[in-house]
Amino acid sequence: MEHNFKWKNDGRTKIMIGCGTRPEIIRLAAVIKRCREYFDCCVVYYNQNWDRNLSTVFWEDFELKNTFGEYGPDILVPVVGENLGVTCGNILGRSYELLSELQPEGYLVLGDTNSCLSAISAKRLHSPLFHMEAGNRCKDECLPEETNRRIVDVISDVNMCYSEFARKYLADTGVPKERTYQTGSPMAEVLHMNLEKIQKSDVLERLGLEKDKYILLSAHREENIDSEKNFLSLFTAINALAEKYDMPILYSCHPRSKHRLEKSGFQLDPRVRVNEPLGFNDYNKLQMNALAIVSDSGTLPEESSFYLSIGHPIAAVCIRTSTERPEALEAGDFILAGITTRELLNATDMAIEMKQKGVLGKPCPDYVDETVSMKVVRIIQGYVNVVNKMVWRKY
């Protein structure tokens, strides 16, 4: 595979980070910076999210520069094929080729995307494998991520989970407890790192919106978009929400979601404004000023907890029927709404009224720790040699 990356060979541990989607860039932002500070680091991007608004803009938002001094990863790997099988095959084949060539001393992945399946290549090549966001479970087999989670959890040498719930799920699968660590979520560190930029964003002025006079919408998950039944149920509910509140609903719309809407011919209420995907700082500024946030994003519970911790609660409504973040539900940081009209209207009414009355949950401790990147690099540094010696018997 053609690329220009070379290790610095400065004596530091050689760590490769594999990612392929917008959420991974966001969650790994502080960790990537910390790894570049303490390791000889190579960031590989498998380009699942190929649209500029879902990839390039985020490297810029977080000022993540590669070894060549440019915003972006060190190595960009095209993997998207004509179907899921080809894409996953490309991820496995091309990650195997890169790992074979560069031979990092450790490989780090986060989460549950198809790009995380590159972990299989690292395992087969005896590269110590570290997994952030390990142990997340929503117990819903309709989510493709649930399969990826189990695969990567079980084969990883060291699992780093967000919460005690996740640690328990890992233990239930038989993953060694002695190589499982609870680090907390990296999102608070990322949000704090960008809070000043978020607050300075002029996105409301650019979009002609006013504080508390719009609802922010994000709907992109496969189970909501690709299922005909769920798609119709959800967007019928969104139209009902627009009619009830009679204000703009700003839809940060992914390309595949937009394509699905166009292909279906579904007529959105005129008050639902379909917008291109927004950058991190703009989107969070919109979250901080919206009357309510209606989203199927996995980061919503963590963002809600963070904003609650800094005295700026948001009305967070999750348009899903399951969650892999029960600790945030337990803390009262968001409402799990479902995707029917009745469920969505009731949940949104409740979230808005509770916020206005100051009836709030409490910040989830796992979601407000701003030292996660430090923990991650220390764990990696400590276990690279242990895994090479005890698991792979390299010396």
What do the PLM-derived regions correspond to, one by one?
Residues 2, 48-53, 78-79, 152-229, ...:
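A nucleotide-sugar donor-handling region in carbohydrate enzymes
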Residues 353-395:
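C-terminal amphipathic helix plus adjacent low-complexity
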Residues 10, 98-105, 209-210, 289:
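Glycine-rich phosphate-binding loop signature in dinucleotide/nucleotide-binding domains
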Residues 41-49:
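A short beta-strand-loop structural module common to alpha/beta enzyme folds
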Residues 108-110, 116-119, 131-132, 159, ...:
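A donor-sugar binding/catalytic signature common to diverse glycosyltransferases
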Residues 48-51, 56, 199-289, 394:
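Donor-nucleotide binding loops and adjacent catalytic segments primarily
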Residues 14-19, 24-34, 38, 58, ...:
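Active-site and donor-binding regions of nucleotide-sugar-utilizing enzymes
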